A protein has these predicted regions:
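Short, flexible loop/turn elements at secondary-structure junctions
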Residues: 1, 22, 32-35, 167, ...
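GT-A fold catalytic core of metal-dependent nucleotide-sugar glycosyltransferases
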Residues: 18-58
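Long, low-complexity C-terminal extensions of enzymes
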Residues: 137-240
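Long, charge-rich alpha-helical interaction segments
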Residues: 52-148
């Protein structure tokens, strides 16, 4: 991160500079701190023929929350640089892929609508190409430099979904329904389901989304810890 933008208290800002990490591979996977692998996983889950595996499916966006307003900022940039008709004409099989199931219903309904809307993003590990970040910066440098002055989160921010959507609109992805083996558990309302899913390894990837309002936080934390210890009894090299 350029020194003139420090100190930073805005994770969105840090994320738009991910490609600057020294020795970062062209193919990389971005994990937030609440994402966990709980089952066997191979690189093919994230990449095929050198391209990220992802779902290209629209979702509704009310713009009521700050996060949704940020997603709308992303889409305004996408519509500035991509022609939806041309993208769909070139890649209709990627957007209307049967593997998406009912999650692609808006794709069919909006097939002839001229503009992109917000894409679905499962709250879990996201595969990227470093060259995608470089391409976005090349084309949107002014907007991203302006955002770099936002030391704290702002309604005018962009998010990593900008890079995911750019990647998809550039046809740099392989269709894959990422919902089939991932699950997000808000621990405030689904702590028991989360503990059970970890212990039974019901998914490949889970997001354990916590917050300060979780009831019986200490007990929930302890039960999750026991579930992880049951499936991962040996310490990794990292922990030794």
């Amino acid at each position: 991160l350029p020194e003139q933008y420090l100190p930073v208290f805005n994770s969105n800002l840090i994320e738009i500079y991910m490609h600057k990490i020294p020795d970062l591979s062209e193919q990389f996977v971005y994990f937030n701190d609440d994402f966990f692998i709980i089952n066997h996983l191979s690189p093919k889950r994230f990449f095929e023929d050198g391209l990220p595996k992802d779902i290209a499916a629209f979702r509704t966006n009310t713009g009521l929350s700050q996060y949704e307003r940020m997603l709308q900022n992303n889409i305004r940039l996408i519509n500035k640089h991509f022609d939806k008709k041309e993208v769909f004409k070139k890649d209709s099989w990627k957007w209307l892929n049967p593997s998406y199931g009912k999650r692609a219903r808006l794709n069919y309904l909006l097939k002839y609508y001229n503009k992109f809307i917000t894409l679905r993003t499962p709250h879990n590990a996201q595969p990227f190409l470093k060259s995608t970040f470089e391409d976005v910066w090349k084309n949107c440098e002014n907007e991203l430099k302006e955002m770099s002055t936002h030391r704290f989160r702002s309604n005018k921010d962009y998010t990593p979904e900008l890079f995911k959507t750019w990647q998809i609109c550039s046809s740099n992805f392989i269709p894959y329904n990422t919902y089939q083996d991932t699950k997000m558990f808000p621990l405030m309302i689904k702590s028991k389901q989360a503990i059970k899913a970890v212990r039974e390894q019901s998914y490949t990837l889970v997001c354990l989304n916590d917050n300060i309002h979780i009831r019986n936080y200490q007990q929930t934390h302890e039960n999750l810890k026991k579930s992880f210890e049951a499936i991962l009894p040996e310490k990794s090299d990292f922990e030794i």
